Design a protein with these regions (language model features):
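Long amphipathic alpha-helical coiled-coil/heptad-repeat bundle
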Residues: 2-237
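Aromatic-residue detector
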Residues: 8-44, 54-55, 67-70, 74, ...
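Proline-rich intrinsically disordered, low-complexity coils
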Residues: 10, 24-26, 90, 95, ...
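Interfaces and regulatory segments of ATP-dependent nucleotide/adenylate/phosphodiester-chemistry enzymes
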Residues: 143-354, 471-518
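Catalytic core segments in nucleotide and nucleic-acid processing enzymes
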Residues: 319-518
Length: 518
């Protein structure tokens, strides 16, 4: 199954320090000398280019005029020397590919553009091209910077754990945009949006749904989903090889909805308000005039099908009085919807063709109401035991953007390891090994345990994470001297169970075989 196979390309951003030895100006000082409207379109062009101008050669031949020949030649000579040194460095075991532009570069450029209040645009074209180039290299320096403490084995080589931590720092908060197709994400968001609204109809979220629809000007949630699907079709069907433009007819049909999810091209957004592109995610459209809107990127539009809805509902909940307000709103969503509604539904579906015991966390609670820390889902088929833990967590955006593994690791330990997630799995494994697992009185003599951690947020399921969490699990098990056969921990996105729901239910694929192959 493709979802379990990941090709990791060792791509390296070309940064300012690689090309220039002088002290740079702030990024804003370079960009403010260019035309804002042109810069906006350039950034969108890069975001939607699909890597067309990824290499330095493609960039300089496309975006520099002939009058900048000497400048371009100097840059290419410097980078060719850098490539040669890297190639001859015996410590670089894996060949590296250098690039200058990515979707992340374009998004960060757009964020910088909208943080500037005044543009002058008086410099000659040659200088403007050089300034833009320098700004891009500085942006690359910012987005590629990571902080991972080096770890060595007995042979003075980097440990696998060090490589795993480095991968997490490089991919986290970027992975979804760079590695998954927008069409794939769209389908998943539609499915989850559908189930979320169905859940709202028969839960404490009924008044929240009513207010949400009122705020967005719709009579029903099906109408809302229809309009959002129309919105995401614009960036998805972008066929002009530039960037999508939404043009309304003279009657301005759809204007109110688009306007509610947009901001003016003249708007100034301080970077503190757009950390992790929070502002862009809330308002994924740039309004040029009443007929013209520019989608910032496909994913931000797609997320209005489901992911962004949480934040709108949270604001609505905060505005209610105590008679309607849900205390502990985030916990309510993660427990009642994410776990007991969505997770239960799709794990049951995944195991539909399997025989044996299948117990949700609620089932376990009913069996022993006074017993705490029941498994989120337990399944035994013969000697094979599948222990599931489900986590719908959010990592602080400042921690994600900082790309400092000390801080990222602390967050992962707090939310996925200590007393939760991994530690919960270890406790259940110890109970099974000691034959005092109260939820299954007929444990086999020689069980085989498959520990599984299901994450709701696909942004967290990045290369390296599974290795880190399994390392934590194995370290705990060594301390406990467990005798039972334990397979390595597998981290699975809930999206995977949703994507292959039909295949699981019909028995065309089986979880046990997928895990063993993985």
């Amino acid at each position: 199954i493709d979802v379990f196979i990941m090709k990791i390309e060792p791509n390296i951003y070309i940064t300012y320090e690689m090309v220039f030895s002088d002290e740079p100006l702030p990024i804003s000082d370079y960009l403010k000398e260019l035309d804002k409207n042109w810069l906006i379109r350039f950034a969108l062009f890069i975001i939607y280019s699909g890597g067309k101008f990824k290499t330095l050669n493609n960039y300089v031949t496309t975006f520099f005029c002939k009058q900048n020949h000497d400048f371009v030649k100097s840059v290419l000579d410097i980078m060719n020397n850098h490539y040669a040194k890297t190639l001859n460095d015996p410590t670089n075991i894996i060949p590296r590919t250098y690039f200058i532009l990515s979707e992340s570069t374009g998004l960060e450029l757009l964020k910088q553009i909208f943080s500037i209040s005044n543009f002058t645009n008086v410099l000659p074209q040659t200088t403007q091209e050089q300034y833009l180039f320098k700004a891009i290299l500085l942006i690359n320096s910012n987005i590629s910077e990571t902080n991972v403490l080096e770890e060595f084995d007995d042979n003075k080589n980097f440990t696998n754990l060090y490589y795993a931590k480095s991968l997490v720092c490089n991919f986290i908060n970027n992975h979804e945009r760079l590695n998954l197709k927008s069409e794939f994400i769209s389908v998943l968001q539609i499915i989850k949006g559908y189930y979320f609204f169905k859940f709202c109809e028969k839960s404490k979220l009924q008044p929240h749904l009513t207010q949400f629809l009122k705020n967005n000007g719709f009579q029903s949630w099906t109408q809302y989903l229809y309009n959002v699907i129309q919105l995401i079709l614009y960036p998805l069907k972008n066929e002009n090889d530039k960037f999508p433009v939404i043009k309304l007819n003279e009657r301005l049909e759809g204007y109110n909805y688009l306007h509610a999810h947009s901001f003016s091209a003249d708007y100034v957004i301080p970077t503190s308000e757009n950390c992790d592109y929070t502002f862009f995610k809330t308002y994924p459209l740039i309004e040029i005039d009443k007929q013209t809107f520019l989608p910032i990127n496909a994913i931000f539009c797609i997320n209005h099908l489901y992911r962004s809805i949480y934040f709108e509902f949270n604001k609505i909940n905060a505005s209610f009085d105590n008679s309607v307000k849900i205390k502990g709103f985030s916990t309510y969503i993660t427990t009642e919807f994410s776990e007991k509604y969505l997770f239960y539904k799709f794990v049951k579906n995944t195991l539909y063709k399997q025989r044996g015991i299948k117990l949700t966390g609620d089932d376990c609670k009913k069996l022993f109401p006074k017993k705490d820390k029941e498994p989120d889902f337990y399944h035994r088929d013969g000697n094979n035991i599948f222990l599931f833990e489900n986590k719908d967590i959010k990592i602080n955006k400042d921690v994600l953007n900082g790309k400092d593994y000390n801080k990222i690791g602390d967050e992962l330990n707090k939310k996925l390891v200590r007393k939760v997630g991994v530690d919960q799995l270890v406790e259940h494994i110890k109970a099974i090994d000691a034959r005092n697992f109260i939820w299954d009185k007929k444990l086999p003599k020689h069980p085989r345990i498959y520990p599984i951690l299901v994450l709701d947020d696909s942004l967290l399921c990045v290369p390296g994470l599974n290795y880190i969490l399994n390392d934590a699990l194995q370290s705990q098990l060594k301390k406990c001297d467990v005798k039972t056969k334990i397979y390595p921990l597998v981290v699975i996105e809930l999206d995977t169970l949703i994507s292959y729901a039909t295949y699981f239910k019909t028995g065309k694929i089986h979880l046990k075989k997928l895990i063993e192959d993985y």
